[in-house]
Regions:
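Polybasic (Lys/Arg-rich)
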Residues: 18-52
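Walker A/P-loop
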Residues: 76-98, 110
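Nucleic-acid nuclease catalytic cores
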Residues: 1-23
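A substrate-engagement module of RecA-like helicase motors
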Residues: 47-49, 54, 107-216, 221-224, ...
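Walker A/P-loop NTP-binding motif
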Residues: 72-73, 92-107, 127-131
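Generic beta-sheet signal
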Residues: 79-83, 109-111, 215-218, 242-244
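Conserved pre-motif I regulatory segment
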Residues: 41-84
Length: 307
């Protein structure tokens, strides 16, 4: 039944189906969901079993065992822990290991390893690799910025321009299922490989893939930036037991200032004024006032001191 919201005209189409065809349709519909639920059930069981058998992969250094215990109890009590220690003492493995342990008993749904640099993302990947070598079954994805993973030289998401955007949603489910059932380590190269295979947008596919992964390695922005954060996890209605391992957290202060700060450029006001001066004199006058005010601020900043 369709209703025209303007005229309130109602048009109905009536169809008759026998019970056999309805049952067949329903079973096909459920079968489409069943393979995903089977994946979640089987993967979670295998992951939890591997975690229960997992041991710390090195001999504990001085203070390291205490650090591991502190991280685990912090996760369990849903509190915040700030760790300051010299480079090379094993902070990464000492935080990732207890976070992984918390996944097997329902404390944690997903681990976010947040970084400010590409090189530290590599450290996180290597740490997970060490745990996999020790027997861990744990799927991770490393998220890459859209402009760094796009197949086009200049990304354009218009389906008429990008062949990977054209028909993306018709193919992405199969692409995601393919990659998560065949790869445990999903990074930029893996995403690009499967996006070419299935002709889907690599960036959007990586976000969909993250839903089915145990660990997500990504930039601070994906968690904290109000414009770039992953709405599927942190938007309205997004809810889950997540652990955040914030690498080099002291860098987050400056990044947060940038995320929550806006910038106005004086030259932009001048350009806009010149564009509209022959069309809307009132608007041009307002833009000129803004330009003059910002010029006065600029001159003020040029002074060595202000009284």
């Amino acid at each position: 039944t369709y209703c025209n919201t303007e005229t309130e005209q109602i048009v109905s189409f009536k169809e008759q189906y026998d019970s056999e065809s309805i049952i067949k349709w329903y079973r096909e519909l459920v079968a489409g969901f069943k393979k995903w639920m089977d994946y979640v059930f089987d993967e979670r069981a295998e992951r939890n079993a591997s975690i229960q058998k997992l041991h710390f992969p090195f001999e504990y250094r001085e203070g390291q065992k205490k650090l591991v215990a502190s991280v685990y109890h912090t996760v369990k009590e849903q509190k915040v822990l700030y760790i300051q220690a010299p480079t090379g003492v094993g902070k990464t493995i000492s935080t990732v290991y207890p976070a992984v342990q918390s996944c097997s008993n329902g404390l944690t749904d997903k681990i976010f390893y947040l970084t400010s640099k590409t090189i530290t993302r590599t450290v996180a990947e290597e740490t997970y690799a060490i745990l996999r070598d020790a027997g861990l079954h744990f799927r991770t994805v490393t998220l890459t910025a859209k402009d760094k993973i796009c197949h086009l030289d200049e990304h354009n998401c218009n389906p008429e321009v990008c062949e990977y955007a054209r028909g993306h949603f018709d193919r992405v489910n199969e692409a995601v299922y393919d990659i998560i059932t065949n790869e445990a380590v999903i990074n930029r190269d893996t995403i690009l490989q499967y996006s070419v295979k299935h002709k889907v947008c690599p960036y959007e596919m990586s976000l969909d893939v993250s839903y089915w992964c145990d660990g997500i390695i990504c930039d601070y922005n994906y968690a904290f930036d109000p414009d770039s954060s992953l709405k599927r996890y942190f938007g309205d209605g997004g809810k889950g037991n997540y652990v955040f391992l914030v690498d080099e957290a002291h860098n987050l202060v400056d990044r947060a200032r940038q995320m929550y700060s806006a910038t106005l450029v004086k030259e932009d006001f001048l350009k806009c004024k010149n564009l509209v001066k022959d069309i809307d004199k009132r608007l041009a006058s307002s833009l000129e006032k803004c330009n003059k005010y910002m010029l006065s601020l600029k001159r003020m900043c040029d002074k060595e001191y202000i009284i």
